């Protein structure tokens, strides 16, 4: 398991844009499972939507990308490379994510070729699919 501090050592995201609270499973370069506890205190709920708070779908996908980034970064430790979110395909939103929900973010790295990696991700709430997407990352020297 990785704590938020260990996650911050692997990916560059910080508050308010770090969307992963912990990683509970990790196989470097292969797969990761992360958790995001969604609370009413999230800044985005002020405007999305004031009378029916729903987590923006794009932020659910960003959370999946961050978990994928942890798996990629763990395999790249010791290098000056970071995996940047480059593309998204086949994205589907199946249910709203609301304050009080816990997102289980499951990702798998499906291909790494040269400076490009591909991953699939599924976000669950209480075992029910909330969102799924295919993601592409480009490695960049930093």
UniProtKB/Swiss-Prot annotation:
SUPFAM superfamilies: Thioesterase/thiol ester dehydrase-isomerase
GO terms for biological process, alphabetical: fatty acid biosynthetic process; lipid A biosynthetic process
Active site per database record: 48
A Pfam family of this chain: FabA
Subcellular location: Cytoplasm
Keyword Transport applies: no
Leader sequence segment: none
Main location: cytoplasm
Organism domain of life: Bacteria
Tagged with keyword Metal-binding: no
UniProt GO molecular function: (3R)-hydroxyacyl-[acyl-carrier-protein] dehydratase activity
Catalytic reaction list: a (3R)-hydroxyacyl-[ACP] = a (2E)-enoyl-[ACP] + H2O
Keywords: Cytoplasm, Lipid A biosynthesis, Lipid biosynthesis, Lipid metabolism, Lyase
Cellular component terms per the entry's GO annotation: cytoplasm; membrane
EC number: 4.2.1.59
Function: Involved in unsaturated fatty acids biosynthesis. Catalyzes the dehydration of short chain beta-hydroxyacyl-ACPs and long chain saturated and unsaturated beta-hydroxyacyl-ACPs.
Cited HAMAP family: FabZ
Family (UniProt): Belongs to the thioester dehydratase family. FabZ subfamily.
Protein name as annotated: 3-hydroxyacyl-[acyl-carrier-protein] dehydratase FabZ
Organism: Shouchella clausii (strain KSM-K16) (Alkalihalobacillus clausii)
Gene coding for it: fabZ
